[in-house]
Structure formats: C-alpha cells, structure tokens
Amino acid sequence: MEYEGVLKRLVDYAERAVARGAKAVILVGSLARGDYTAFSDADIIIISDEVPENPIRRISDFMDPSLPVDVEPLVLTTEEFLKMAKEGRRIVREAIFYGKLLFGDPEIIKAASRYLEFEDGSSERWEGE
C-alpha cells in the first residue's frame, strides 16, 4: 500500500482511538519524517488519561492487526507526556518537531512544546499539520 493509503488508515485508527477516550494520536518516526522504507512500522504516541496503570495493558488496548503496517503504540497520560517534555525526552522532542497529529487535540502538543528548546537556546512552537 502506498504512503497516502497507509496515512489514511492511520488517521481512521486515530479517530477510533479518540472516540474511545484518547486525547491525541501522534505519528512519529520514519513515517512522520518521510524517510520510511517498505519495512517501516508506524510509531504512534497515544495520549489518554483513561488508561490502565499496567503498560502492557495500555498497549494491547490500542493494537489493531487489521492495519496495513505494524503499529508500535506508546500510550501516555497527559501528565506523563508533559513530564517527559520537561525532561527533554527524545520521543517527545520528535513528536513536537517532526510528528504529525493524526487526530485529537493539538493543545497538548503546544503545551509540551513550551518546555523544549534547541541547543542554541531558541524554541520552536508546534504549529500543527
């Protein structure tokens, strides 16, 4: 399946996740950056405050074997996502600088972007897709 078809299916997946309580679904990794290959999976950050404490249960709640690519979800609460932004964690930096909001509330990403700066001290605000 071509990139546009995969992206459409991922947006549908994200819409279903938001309908089930997720606040935002963000595509990160090679599919978001555009340097994907035929073997790339879909790295997804799902922000939801309605998730189990157990990380494995969180992931299994958002698996979908019907998608044309393997999905690697990272499921975080809003508090966890913002804490990771404050810590400058790579995955959150990637979400802010290269990520594609598939569906959900862009304000969460904007809030996290306030904590991040480039090495030269300047900051970049996420403007959305």
Language-model regions, residue ranges each:
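Catalytic core of pol beta-like nucleotidyltransferases
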Residues: M1-A24, A32-A38, D49-E129
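Conserved binding/catalytic microenvironments
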Residues: D41
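Helix-adjacent hinge/juxtasegments
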Residues: I44-S48
